[in-house]
């Protein structure tokens, strides 16, 4: 991965674009890889849900600055549009992080809602939603007990505070925010309808075997994911 990123940076330098380009590195979600005795990714523990984001823009953004605010993947499009001085997307909840980073703005006077959500909704499992608000994080699994963590004091998420009465206030506040505009039963019904539509299309594809010139067919030796 480092080599391929290096090729992109070399191409920018070769074309004299390296000093006038905003570079954003962002990954997909993580994997549990045994943390909390779990594998794969369908949880909201930090190893699964948290992703790195690195921005580099010579002359515009300071080197080595680290944000302590809570940001979301939704903020990426708003940040790129802000960098282009383009209008924000309509109905987008994304927020540009440039006011928090640029020395000329230095974050002064920026009103930043220190909150982010993540969801996992399918037709074959309970609907999940997570909220991160400041140092607090609540994992909501519909029909199951919630989990509450203070990431400042417990970054490894080993001490579930949802069972402690001292934290009932913050727990109820976060549960209310989770349910604001989010109905797990309605979402489950929507996902079942989508699955029915998918099954029709999948059946058609199996029976007709349409030519797909855009499909990337892996060689047997490359298809290692399920081995």
Give the positions of each predicted feature:
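Beta-strand elements within well-structured catalytic alpha/beta cores of enzymes
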Residues: 1, 5, 22-27, 53-55, ...
């Amino acid at each position: 991965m480092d080599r391929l990123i290096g090729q992109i940076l070399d191409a920018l330098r070769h074309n004299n674009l390296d000093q006038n380009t905003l570079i954003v590195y962002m990954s997909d979600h993580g994997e549990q890889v045994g943390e909390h005795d779990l594998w794969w990714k369908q949880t909201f523990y930090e190893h699964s849900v948290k992703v790195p984001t690195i921005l580099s823009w010579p002359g515009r953004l300071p080197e080595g600055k680290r944000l302590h605010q809570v940001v979301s993947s939704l903020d990426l499009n708003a940040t790129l549009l802000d960098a282009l001085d383009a209008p924000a997307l309509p109905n987008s909840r994304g927020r540009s992080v440039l006011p928090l980073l640029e020395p000329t703005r230095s974050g002064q006077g920026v009103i930043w809602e220190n909150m982010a959500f993540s969801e996992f909704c399918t037709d074959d499992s309970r609907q999940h939603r997570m909220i991160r608000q400041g140092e607090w994080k609540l994992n909501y699994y519909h029909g199951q007990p919630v989990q509450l963590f203070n990431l400042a004091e417990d970054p490894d998420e080993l001490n579930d505070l949802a069972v402690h009465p001292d934290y009932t206030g913050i727990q109820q506040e976060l549960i209310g925010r989770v349910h604001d505009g989010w109905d797990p039963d309605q979402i489950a019904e929507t996902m079942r309808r989508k699955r029915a539509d998918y099954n029709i299309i999948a059946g058609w594809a199996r029976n007709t075997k349409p030519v797909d010139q855009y499909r990337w067919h892996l060689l047997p030796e490359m298809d290692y994911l399920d081995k």
